[in-house]
Amino acid sequence: MDPGECTCMSGGICICGDNCKCTTCNCKTCRKSCCPCCPPGCAKCAQGCICKGGSDKCSCCA
């Protein structure tokens, strides 16, 4: 499995580590994962963005 294409369940154990660049990884332990509310192509997506509640925006891709 490509470490940049992991698919973690929310709250599960993330196996991607700091190299996680997938858009479906919701693990809290994967600090550099993309959050599900991050739009495609967001350059800052892998910088620990956090989704703000039920909105479709996150802290780094407003």
Curated annotation (Swiss-Prot):
GO biological process: cellular response to cadmium ion; cellular response to copper ion; cellular response to zinc ion; detoxification of copper ion; intracellular zinc ion homeostasis
Amino acids binding a divalent metal cation 4: 34-35, 45, 49
Origin: domain of life: Eukaryota
Single GO molecular function: metal ion binding
Residues bound to a divalent metal cation 3: 16, 20, 25, 30
Keywords: Copper, Metal-binding, Metal-thiolate cluster, Zinc
Protein name: Metallothionein-4
Species this protein is from: Canis lupus familiaris
